[in-house]
Structure formats: C-alpha cells, structure tokens
Amino acid sequence: MACPLDQAIGLLVAIFHKYSGQEGDKNTLSKSELKELIQKELTIGAKLQDAEIAKLMDDLDRNKDQVVNFQEYVTFLGALAMIYNDVLRG
C-alpha cells in the first residue's frame, strides 16, 4: 500500500494529465485546460475572474509558449503549498 505522500504526489500528477491534452499536446495545459483545472480542482478556483486566471497563466508560462508544461505546473503547486503552509501556521 502506498504511503500518504506517495498517494498525494500521484494525485497531483493524475490531475495534470486529467486536463492536459484535451486540446492538443497531451503533456501541456492550454489556457482553457488550466482554467478548467483551477475551477474544478481548487476551492478558490470558482472565485477567480477570467482576468486573474489569464494573469496566472502568463505568470506560470515561463518559456512563453502559450501552454503550461508539467514543470511549470509543479512550480505552481509549490507556490500553492507555500500559501497553504502560511495559512495553516497562522
């Protein structure tokens, strides 16, 4: 049986691949795929406006190829983990 951290990492990878490739490359998220992922998988996602999601996409897309690859997605998750840590620590 997998340890909780193994399961969590597997889930993060699975969520990326659940949304990636619906519109093209199966290893990247388009702007609309990222928007759907954020809105469906994060509590805060439903509260974000389109302009905020577009800004997030621009910030995440480090190489400016108009998609978010897995490395850019992991960077996003790291930033989210830092925010969650700050909230949980008070």
Swiss-Prot record:
SMART domains: EFh, S_100. CDD domains: S-100A6. Keywords: Acetylation, Calcium, Cell membrane, Cytoplasm, Membrane, Metal-binding, Nucleus, Repeat. InterPro entries: EF-hand-dom_pair, EF_Hand_1_Ca_BS, EF_hand_dom, S-100A6, S100/CaBP7/8-like_CS, S100_Ca-bd_sub. One of its GO terms (cellular component) is cytoplasm. The modification N6-acetyllysine is found at K40, K47. The modification N6-succinyllysine is found at K47. One of its GO terms (molecular function) is calcium-dependent protein binding. Ca(2+) 2 binds at D61, N63, D65, E72. SUPFAM superfamilies: EF-hand (SSF47473). PROSITE patterns: EF_HAND_1, EF_HAND_2, S100_CABP. Ca(2+) 1 binds at T28, E33. It is found in: Nucleus envelope; Cytoplasm; Cell membrane. Residues 12-47, 48-83 form the EF-hand domain. It is a peripheral membrane protein. One of its GO terms (biological process) is cellular response to virus. May function as calcium sensor and modulator, contributing to cellular calcium signaling. May function by interacting with other proteins, such as TPR-containing proteins, and indirectly play a role in many physiological processes such as the reorganization of the actin cytoskeleton and in cell motility. Binds 2 calcium ions. Calcium binding is cooperative. Homodimer; head to tail assembly of 2 subunits. Interacts with CACYBP in a calcium-dependent manner. Interacts with ANXA2 and ANXA11 (via N-terminus). Interacts with SUGT1. Interacts with TP53; has higher affinity for TP53 that is phosphorylated on its N-terminal domain, and lower affinity for TP53 that is phosphorylated on its C-terminal domain. Interacts with tropomyosin. Interacts with FKBP4. Interacts with PPP5C (via TPR repeats); the interaction is calcium-dependent and modulates PPP5C activity. Interacts with TPPP; this interaction inhibits TPPP dimerization. This is Protein S100-A6. It comes from Sus scrofa (Pig). The lineage of its organism: Eukaryota, Metazoa, Chordata, Craniata, Vertebrata.
